[in-house]
């Protein structure tokens, strides 16, 4: 009998089976095993089964396909490992609760050898052809199962039936549950079978079937095809009955191919009827041993390869000995088990050898790939690290990222500190902005993200960088970056920086690998600890067991979870306990009393499912850990091999290959020495000098200050003394607690002004001060020239010289002198001589002066230098009247210019040194001018006036002598503040100074832009300045204050202003006659006025300066701002009231005292022609205007007359309001200031109207001047307003008088028009 050949020569086997079922849990297990053997014949077996199932019916469909073509043993053992993803028949169970249902299933199988089952007759059955059992199903894609596949069981390693047999797993009956033992010993009247969770268990049912086969095989049948023993064509295919109920078969049924062909032809009509079973309503439960089943949730195991069919009552059964057959089968199973183990060990050895060979073959290939493509290895490592990081918990990921960030910050700060040390700028502390420390690493990375410092500066994104870092002062942040981080950024771009970056990257990668290793080791330790805890908890849990049967509590260490250990010895007493009665029609059944079932608490489906999921997760985790360990080992091996390869490669001799030169880069040797000097060392010395430069002390740290000593230092020619004195005075004058009194030390002001004049003279002539050549000094022996005070001293010296020469006189010595002695003629005695009187020699003064002048050791010294405007190189070519806002724009452009010279130091350029000293002097004068006592002395000081005049000339006429625009604007600010403080007592020295002051004041206004003209002024056609805005600054108000104060002093200031504004000849001026340089001043003044008016060729614009001054004063009055602020204009008036008052006063002075026809009586005759003729005859000879400027001012687009009238009404309303909450009414000075402003407004309107009429009468241009004046809107008050004003008792009488005069003028104009 051949057990390994599965060939079947039967052509058609048609079986009809009818069975009776009880109220039990029935399971239909449909498995199809296709063994593609070319030697097999195709058999078509169709069987039809009718069954009624009243409980859960489960359809389990599995397909196991084994490849043939190898030896017989390999047909039994399939070494292919289990892959759950490849199992196409892993279907879930479908529970259908059907009460008293008759289900008919028809299944067709292709290429399937259907054995004939030999069954102990539990019920009569008829065998017919064309029908098969209800659980045969071909799981091919062309044929679908009639049942819904919904099985949740996992296929246990997807073993084929041959492999199940090859494993030879036999279980002891003592390990079976109680119900299974009852079925084992209770005979064949029970239609229920137990479900065992083990795939490789041979049940006692199988042994009983083996005995029945041996008995049936010995009996003879009338059919010619029946044989007493199985031949080679009769296949015996045992299988594991793992389902709880297979097609309602009894426990002693067996799958076999052993059947006679005549048995298929014996069918009767009674085969379709159901025969009741004696053990009806026998409810048996399936006991599942879940400890030994780790992969299935239910007890249905889908490893059935054939379908048992009920044998009809007329089956030919033989009466051979069952014990002999069983012993043969047991011996065969033992042999198969030994062969299987040996084969499995051999296969394992072969697989290990193949794996070792593959690894050895892959190592050199991997080395080559690593050498050829290092970038790929690097990217692969990064991907591995990224995948490992993603698999970690978020908390671990955050912790690892924090460690990496800290390490990266540490490396950055070390590199930055080292770079600062190399540049001799050690980073002592982290910089702060607003008591907040700056994170240099974040700042550097953010700037690099924007493209670098140059790109951020080019695109002006420093404010955005500061906003990202939440810092308000971006300019300070920019300076910090340029001072500390910009050299580091340039260092990182160099070759050394690139190498340093690569080393940092390698270090960070190694650091990340070490972190990942530590984390993986911790996870492995935690996983092993959790696994041990799970195993201990599982072993301590109770498992259901039948009475008298002992189940092991824990699995053996060598066995897998869910596999029952196989008993090596089959019990011999098993045959004695089985009583089988084989009859042709009926089979006797032995009734065994059932013991009481022990109540065991079953686990719910949820608990079982949770346990299964936990086990699967644990297995997956272990598998991942093993894979990670293998990867790390491979990486370590690869690195070691690569290092060894690199070492060996370096040992080999270098081979140079000729190649085409591409992208040739010549070698560059950096010059460290220039003419033998180390440039780096010299730069370090310079940096040390700058860092050690002393910072000037503050005012409290200076101690006692001697102003007289400071004035003497200013007069010296020593640069250090001068700078120290200037710095001390600047710090002292800027301190509000200290006051410099010029009353006690007036020489201090003289020293400052004289030093300033000398510096301005040197600056204008490009003379470098404080630099003397050795040729300027004259050396002479101190004893060579002796100067005698008296003649007696000289004579005494000669006597001593003769004594020193031993009193020997030479006879012809010209130096000898004859001494005359008076004697008495009678006696001859010497007469007594009177004591000689010492007399001073009379020295010639001219000779002394000539001697001193010719002496090289004595220099001529003048107290004051010549005025700058009279120097030969100071001829005026242009007046630089740059507006204030334009100056600010120029300063900004100058700062943004990369080639600017604003950072040049005085030690580098002598011109910068002079500019700094002049700026210090102007600031000192500005600070000390705020004192009243000092302002009186300053306004009368001749040296200060001269210094101001020279400084104004250079700033306005020749500003190119200064180094930058910022210095020029600072000089203008200092001058306008100083003049504002001293102008109420200042007497202007010359007309040129007066003109320069006017140009200085006008330069702080904002002129209108004329697109038709090249200049910013319209000329005398309209007002040339825009109304002053609050956000423009306060320097325009200082200009208005200067003009108002200078106009208050009539002689000589007002006369100078009148001659300049009216563009008259200043030769007859008394004050100019007193000047020594009158002729030069006249020429310069005419030249300057022509430059300002641009009237070299014609006289059309002779009064541009007058128009600009009046326009500037009108622009200081905020008419539009007050009128637009209708809610509460009192605040604006309170802020601007002093400026408004000064502007109105200055305009009234110009209109009443400077404009001509001021003393004439204004009369309007009824006949305009007569008046015109009279005016022509009485025309003033000094009138040289070609335009009616007062009418131009009234009729301008700003509508000055209407604005002044509305301003007067608003001030009246403020004064007459009943509420006293306004700020103006609470102040005392407003009681006088506001009425004066009101009077000035009305008076100015009246004067402008009168002057307009007078100018027009003198010009004889337009006879309809009265109509034009009357047509100006809102120029005169209405009758109602005049009536309300006159009836208001709270209005000041002076205001009423001015309104009355204006009203009378209105009536006169209207009368003449009528």
UniProtKB/Swiss-Prot annotation:
A Pfam family (short name) is ARID
- Output the GO biological process annotations, alphabetical, semicolon-separated: cellular response to amino acid starvation; chromatin remodeling; DNA-templated DNA replication; positive regulation of mating type switching; positive regulation of transcription by RNA polymerase II; regulation of transcription by RNA polymerase II
Task: Kindly report the protein's main subcellular placement as a broad class.
Answer: nucleus
Biased-composition ranges, Low complexity, are 1-65, 88-112, 213-235, 581-592
Q: State where the C4-type zinc fingers lie.
A: 1241-1258
Annotated stretches, region: Prion domain (PrD): 1-323
- Share any extra remarks: [SWI+] is the prion form of SWI1. [SWI+] is the result of a conformational change of the cellular SWI1 protein that becomes self-propagating and infectious. This conformational change generates a form of SWI1 that assembles into amyloid fibrils. [SWI+]-aggregates sequester soluble SWI1, resulting in reduced growth on carbon sources other than glucose, reminiscent of a partial loss of function of the SWI/SNF chromatin-remodeling complex. [SWI+] can be cured by GdnHCl and by deletion of the molecular chaperone HSP104, which is required for [SWI+] propagation.
Q: Which family does it belong to?
A: Belongs to the SWI1 family.
| PANTHER family xref list | HAT-TRICK, ISOFORM D (PTHR13964:SF27), RBP-RELATED (PTHR13964)
Give the protein's function: Involved in transcriptional activation. Component of the SWI/SNF complex, an ATP-dependent chromatin remodeling complex, which is required for the positive and negative regulation of gene expression of a large number of genes. It changes chromatin structure by altering DNA-histone contacts within a nucleosome, leading eventually to a change in nucleosome position, thus facilitating or repressing binding of gene-specific transcription factors.
What domain comment accompanies this record?
The prion domain (PrD) is a Gln/Asn (Q/N)-rich domain, which is unstructured in its native, soluble form, and which forms a parallel in-register beta-sheet in its amyloid form. The first 37 residues of this domain are sufficient for aggregation, propagation, and transmission of the [SWI+] prion.
- Please identify the protein, giving its name as recorded: SWI/SNF chromatin-remodeling complex subunit SWI1
